[in-house]
From Swiss-Prot:
Any single biological process term in GO: positive regulation of inflammatory response
GO cellular-component term (any): synapse
Gene name, Swiss-Prot/TrEMBL: CAMK2N1
Major subcellular location class: other
Matches recorded under InterPro entries: Camk2n (IPR026779)
A single MF term (Gene Ontology): protein kinase binding
The protein's name in its UniProt record: Calcium/calmodulin-dependent protein kinase II inhibitor 1
Residue segments, region CAMK2 inhibitory domain: 41-68
UniProt subunit comment: Interacts with CAMK2B; the presence of Ca(2+)/calmodulin increases the interaction but is not essential. Interacts with CAMK2A; this interaction requires CAMK2A activation by Ca(2+).
Localization per record: Synapse; Cell projection, Dendrite; Postsynaptic density
Length: 78
């Protein structure tokens, strides 16, 4: 994983005119090889796979009651 390291002290510059204002400093990434994610070398999906989602299993015992109650009454403000 990348570590964020500040530049050297010579790169620090004060921020603002007053002495009570803190300092602003820049930082850089030490290792930027995996910065954009590891999936850059993966092949793009085939045309038939675009937009297809994986099957979702809902494991909630109350889902039938919730769906039934949603169809019985209209949402407020309609």
């Amino acid at each position: 994983m990348s570590e964020v390291l500040p530049y050297g002290d010579e790169k620090l510059s004060p921020y603002g005119d007053g002495g009570d204002v803190g300092q602003i400093f820049s930082c850089r990434l030490q290792d930027t090889n995996n910065f954009f994610g590891a999936g850059q070398n993966k092949r793009p999906p085939k045309l038939g796979q675009i937009g297809r989602s994986k099957r979702v299993v809902i494991e909630d015992d109350r889902i039938d009651d919730v769906l039934k109650n949603m169809t019985d009454k209209a949402p407020p403000g309609v």
